[in-house]
């Protein structure tokens, strides 16, 4: 930044000097008005007058000098001067030099060209590559000294590591494979959800292989100029040929490798040209021996089939979400840099985090360390890991949000309805935690934690989920009446409706329609796929689908209503527990469902005489209630956005 400022200052000084030297020179001496000059001529005080256009340099008889200017053409001036014996000297007008004329005429164009070059250099990354380097590859070559990641830093994806380990062995000992006639795959495509470690695995390959490693993003190819993408692909492979054997890693390849065909607008032509060049370079007329292309994407469905065929990306490595054993290994890798308390058990944390990716687990360990740092602790304990898990799963607490007692009570009934139905219906995930503390965008959260990694779901389990989703709305309706039901169940209704529609149209859970696929692909339109969609069902079939979805919803809605009506004592008791403790866990829910006195949550400190429930002791055991409580008109708009 300082160098650029100095450069511009030097340029400004030079330009000012040039204009100063090429500009008209100012006359030395004082200036006198023309009338005074004429008066002195008439008084015979002037000895010499040098006339240069309208400027007159005057020398008086007493040797004083001054300059005056003729305001208008005066035809009598010359006669008057000669009459008074004034020496008249004529001087030619001052003309600029040829160099100055050329410079002044070309300066605006040169300035525009200079500004254009400056901005082009800035767009090329700071001006270090030259103004015409658009077609040069942006791939960065990393040497073995720059990459410290190894397979020891990658955990939770043993099968994927075994697949890519062959690449490393080939690069180290190619003769071992060649003598048996084997050929190493030219390309490996790593596929998996976001955060599962695809890029980390590529770094580990580079660290283990000890060969040059070129890395580039799929979005670095296509830019504002036509032909830049294809040129960069050619240049990248030219560089790789010079450094072979080597590895090229293309992250997020779906940015440039999407399926060719009709798309939106005409901008896809440049991307297709780039893709065509990549197809030729990977397996075209000229071979690229010793170059292995590794790519990563989380959208393999949009890639062009020609890119996925053998000879280009021969092997697809699925890097999926880790299972419980993989999560434990990942946690141990990230825990190596954190001082841990003796009570830390990675296996317990792994069992409580189903569905977490490697990035989620890394974030979990980091959040736990931050919680410990806020508490001025020297080690990280299980308490911090529980707080971190709740924050990631349910959102950050918003204790500063002001809620009235009526809103808290409505939220407590809503969340209690979810929890009770979740405990009473079959095959439902266990209730892990219920809270009325606002978290994220929700005023309250009921969190269900699966006991293991979910692979598939039965029809009974899905219907239980629908019943549980409507438990919150039904609790409000039963307690306060239909006219006081809030909008807090909007997200629950959306999720339940989508679940029921999928059961009918995709999973064959309708006796009337049978095991047929009725759902149309509803993915977003993207470049490389046709915009037009064909209709695959008649209007009558669509009407039957709507009827089946509605019947499925109503059946589970009525089941949830009956369960809540039969357990009103538990509903009121759970509301009281939530109003007092704000957050209850599985042990408190077990006490409530067993109609026992509720034990305080772990770490609970009695606040004294003041508490939300108006009772200093623990909430009492549920007791049968014959009539619903009086509706509270102050909670008609309690919004639990995304409360489940």
Curated annotation (Swiss-Prot):
Q: Which SUPFAM superfamilies match?
A: FtsH protease domain-like, P-loop containing nucleoside triphosphate hydrolases
Q: Which residues lie on this side of the membrane: Cytoplasmic?
A: 1-4, 120-644
Q: Which cofactor does it need?
A: Zn(2+)
Give residue ranges on the Periplasmic side: 26-98
Q: Which keywords does this Swiss-Prot/TrEMBL entry list?
A: ATP-binding, Cell inner membrane, Cell membrane, Hydrolase, Membrane, Metal-binding, Metalloprotease, Nucleotide-binding, Protease, Transmembrane, Transmembrane helix, Zinc
UniProt-annotated location(s): Cell inner membrane
Question: Altering residue 225 to A/D/E/G/N/Q/R/S/T: what's the impact?
Answer: Does not complement ftsH1 at 42 degrees Celsius, no protease activity in vivo
Q: What is the effect of changing residue 304 to A/N?
A: No in vivo protease activity, no in vitro ATPase activity; probably still binds ATP
Which BP terms from GO are recorded? protein catabolic process; proteolysis
Q: Per the database entry, which stretches of residues form a coiled coil?
A: none
Q: Where is this region: Disordered?
A: 598-644
What is the protein name for this chain?
Answer: ATP-dependent zinc metalloprotease FtsH
* Species in which this protein is naturally found: Escherichia coli (strain K12)
Source taxonomy: Bacteria, Pseudomonadati, Pseudomonadota, Gammaproteobacteria, Enterobacterales
